[in-house]
């Protein structure tokens, strides 16, 4: 079982913690992680693109000129696709781009990125993370004490408003609950700060 240092929020070590090998100690599967990121990014697309077809463009109800005798090509409407200002053929319409990968694949992806953080020594497990009031200065001091200088994902066991508000104005820092941890967030942040209680919740779901 992988073993990592356990820290308190002052930045000093408080011993070690053993992580579940089936969650934090697997061989990362890069192709599955790639598929999971594609799925998440697809679901973020708005899909509100829209153009008008010939039935939706204003006008064009009258035949522009008679069928025969003018010498010109026959036309039925000034809103046909070949006309300037006419309707678009097979243009984009509003749609949802979201899709779901199988549950086992999604779980393998999140296990892979969590294991990668352990392998790269980019995971910091905290005994607890509590703040009496929401103060950005206090959160910045905690991150500095833990030598976190780049983008960091903070994972708490439950909703913690003080922590979320304190980290909100720090660039590159995101706070999520254990049940909301996802592949895209873990990959987009160099450091993973996770409380001991959150580790237990994640292991309970994924092990």
Swiss-Prot record:
Q: Name one GO biological process term.
A: translation
Q: Name one GO molecular function term.
A: structural constituent of ribosome
What keywords sit in the KW lines? Ribonucleoprotein, Ribosomal protein, RNA-binding, rRNA-binding
Spell out the Basic residues composition-biased ranges: 60-71
User: Which InterPro entries does the record match to this protein?
Assistant: Ribosomal_uL4 (IPR002136), Ribosomal_uL4-like (IPR013005), Ribosomal_uL4_dom_sf (IPR023574)
Q: Which domain of life is it from?
A: Bacteria
GO terms for CC? ribonucleoprotein complex; ribosome
Where are the stretches annotated Disordered?
48-85
Per UniProt, subunit arrangement is:
Part of the 50S ribosomal subunit.
| Function of the protein | One of the primary rRNA binding proteins, this protein initially binds near the 5'-end of the 23S rRNA. It is important during the early stages of 50S assembly. It makes multiple contacts with different domains of the 23S rRNA in the assembled 50S subunit and ribosome. Forms part of the polypeptide exit tunnel.
> Which family is this sequence assigned to?
Belongs to the universal ribosomal protein uL4 family.
Cite the HAMAP family for this sequence.
Ribosomal_uL4_B
Please report the name of this protein according to its UniProt entry.
Large ribosomal subunit protein uL4
Organism taxonomic ancestry: Bacteria, Bacillati, Bacillota, Bacilli, Bacillales
Task: Name the gene for this chain.
Answer: rplD
